[in-house]
Amino acid sequence: MRVLELTQENKKNVLDELIKRSPNHYGEYEAIVADIVENIKENGDKALFEYTAKFDKFELNADNIRVTEAEIEEAYASISPEYIEVMKEAFQNIKAYHEMQVRNSWFSTKPDGSILGQRITPIAKVGVYVPGGKAAYPSSTLMNIVPALVAGCERIVMVTPPNSEGKVNAGTLAAAKIAGVKEIYKCGGAQAIASLAYGTESVPKVDKIVGPGNIFVALAKRAVYGYVSIDSIAGPSEILILADETANPRFVAADLLSQCEHDEMASGILITTSKELADKVVKEVDGFVAAAPRKAILEKSLSNYGYILVANSMEDAIEAANDIASEHLEIITKNPFETMTKIKNAGAIFLGEYSSEPLGDYFAGPNHVLPTNGTAKFFSPLSVDDFIKKSSVINFSYDALKAVHEKIELFAEKEGLYAHANSIKVRFENE
């Protein structure tokens, strides 16, 4: 890891490098994805089956594309009872947390008798993308399904790629069963996203698509955005730890590596006011990496985006943290709650030395689908809000409209919209 002193002179250059870490040039991939999306749109199942044979090495057809109930039960039975119980408890925690986010419709009656309000309705059809292979995480299955479930979406469809034998990851299917989702289709990649967006003979069209994936999935979501809603275009995982001299260096090192092991583009950043802590964390990181099963990935991610910044004050450290706007922010200081009050930008905030980031990944309840690459400045974690729609409601009586009709007519005429004005005038033309 690189240890740098964070000064007023170098702050801009250092932070620019950290914030702009993800590549923005995907030209060759964009062309491939555009072709896939258009082919699915035009040819439906035929194109989907061809892509599955090409990329997943499995001969998909209309008879085997949907995961059967027997396949779900077989997968569920193959998972250890201990793991099933952990997933069930995690599901309940996630569900309870998201139930606190539920919004209700509201109506307000004004003194003139007019009624204004907001009606909340769930998005009807949602598609959840779940990666396969080494990136198949049952926790992500739960995190993407539960807020849609709590919102009341009437149809939740899941897509996930099969292996060459037509099998789907057992943990993914077990998590889906626990969450109550039974409509699951064996398809992945950009072709699965396009199938959900436009519909095929076998895969239903949905209104919103959520879920993580590789660059092809991300670009496909971007390509269909506007035709359907999407959650976000997620980048590589990232963690930022704010710590003072009271922090345990071994805890800090372990937490940094918890995100760096995801992939070579993941970032782990410590901002501290203690040079002594910084030096100790470096030693602890080296020790953990040497014995880590994912040593090669850790070494690469730390080489690319592993930083320890030593700030002159906690105020400077907090300012830098707000500029970076990390996906995960741990605060390990003498008074973490006080420090948190000064944080403006972060996807999820973990307070104190016993609130390690994996709590949020798996078990605590808040969603682990979080804004990345600085987008926590304007985006939020996946929530029930992502699966609802808000409709404004207006009800005016004759008397209520009569009291204001001339003002509305004036406004419309000043904007040159005379049919707008007439829509009001016609109601009082005989008076």
Each model region followed by its residue ranges:
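Conserved NAD(P)+-binding/catalytic subdomain of aldehyde/semialdehyde dehydrogenases
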Residues: 180-258, 262-267
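Conserved small-residue-rich beta-alpha loop and adjacent elements
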Residues: 108-174
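Short internal beta-strands
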Residues: 154-163, 268-274, 352
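A glycine- and small/hydrophobic-rich beta-loop-beta segment
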Residues: 262, 270-346
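N-terminal Rossmann-like NAD(P)+-binding subdomain of aldehyde/semialdehyde dehydrogenases
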Residues: 1-124
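Flexible, glycine/charged-enriched surface loops at secondary-structure junctions
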Residues: 103-108, 266-271, 291-302, 332, ...
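C-terminal core of ALDH-fold dehydrogenases
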Residues: 323-431
